[in-house]
From Swiss-Prot:
This is Probable xyloglucan endotransglucosylase/hydrolase 1. Its EC number is 2.4.1.207. InterPro entries: Beta-glucanase/XTH, Beta_glucanase, ConA-like_dom_sf, GH16, GH16_AS, XET_C, XTH. The active site is at E107, E111. One of its GO terms (molecular function) is xyloglucan:xyloglucosyl transferase activity. Xyloglucan binds at E111, Q124, T125, N126, N134, R135, E136, D200, W201, G205, R282. It catalyses: breaks a beta-(1->4) bond in the backbone of a xyloglucan and transfers the xyloglucanyl segment on to O-4 of the non-reducing terminal glucose residue of an acceptor, which can be a xyloglucan or an oligosaccharide of xyloglucan. The keyword Signal applies. Residues 23-221 form the GH16 domain. The record marks D109 as: Important for catalytic activity.
Length: 296
């Protein structure tokens, strides 16, 4: 009887380990704004509700607004839930991104490009490494991002960067140093978000202008989750670069699993608006990382 119980207990442990290491980031922890963030500009255009569990950015003719993380990080999992500007939002951009602060900077971007009433939002992502970007991908979302809060997150380790929308991977950027492509592995980044007027380019290449009669525009945020390796000194950077020390370094997070690849392919086939990897006019020879990222 004892042997049977032991076997059953072992099976339970194995099943639990499969659940924990299934290839998806840990479930975000809902925390208020002030735990991890602070205003970065135009604090008079930021509203804090319910003790900071909900935060609104306001855009009008006089100003937009933005906030940033208090700490810098090298690798981790970063997410927040957002409800985008509703109605006629042409010309308005809401951004959530990670960025280092130097000339040859690294950056991981979400940019939500507003549109005329009834037209879908476009989500543009981009990855800068060593100051080089030009890796734009644009998709439509499969839901209305103005009707409720949805999760947007980044998983970043030494192997790859994965960008998620509601746990669906919409982009993977793998470490392609072996192909001569730089990868962000030694420059800590802060997390930023902002709401601003970009009607010179955001909607139909700048043809659609912001309708200020609809101002103020509001983007709302909640669940300010940060689970990263803090790095403010060279010594801390070295510690964060020690592989295997954190959960995001484990084998399950070194690549997408089969289900995640199917979901990524679903996004590619049904919702892609633009992908730099397949823009032959711009890149007659696809950039080297595109094959490894399964974008072509």
């Amino acid at each position: 009887m004892g042997i049977i119980k032991g076997v059953l207990f072992s099976i339970v442990l194995i099943n639990l380990s499969l659940v924990v290491f299934c290839g998806y980031p840990r479930r975000p922890v809902d925390v208020p704004f002030w735990k991890n963030y602070e205003p970065s500009w135009a604090s008079h255009h930021i509203k804090f509700l319910n003790g900071g569990t909900t935060t609104d950015l306001i855009l009008d003719r006089s100003s937009g607004a933005g906030f940033q993380s208090k700490k810098s990080y090298l690798f981790g999992h970063f997410s927040m839930k957002m409800r985008l500007v509703g109605g006629d939002s042409a010309g308005v951009v809401t951004a959530f991104y990670l960025s280092s602060n130097n000339a040859e900077h690294d950056e991981i971007d979400f940019e939500f490009l507003g549109n005329r009433t009834g037209q879908p939002y476009i989500l543009q992502t981009n990855v800068f490494t060593g100051g080089k970007g030009n890796r734009e991908q644009r998709i439509y979302l499969w839901f209305d991002p103005t009707k409720g809060y949805h999760s947007y997150s980044v998983l970043w380790n030494t192997y790859l960067i994965v960008i998620f929308v509601d746990d669906v991977p919409i982009r993977a950027f793998k470490n392609s140093k072996d192909l001569g492509v730089k990868f962000p592995f030694n420059q800590p980044m802060k997390i930023y978000s902002s709401l601003w007027d970009a009607d010179d380019w955001a909607t139909r290449g700048g043809l659609e202008k912001t309708n200020w009669a609809n101002a103020p525009f509001t983007a709302s945020y909640t669940s300010f989750h940060v689970d990263g390796c803090e790095a403010a000194t060279p010594q801390e950077v070295q510690v964060c670069n020690t592989k295997g020390m954190k959960w995001w370094d484990q084998k399950a997070f070194q690549d997408l699993d089969a289900l995640q690849y199917r979901r990524l392919r679903w996004v590619r086939q049904k919702y892609t608006v633009y992908n730099y990897c397949t823009d032959k006019a711009r890149y007659p020879v696809p950039p080297p990382e595109c094959t490894k990222d399964r974008d072509i």
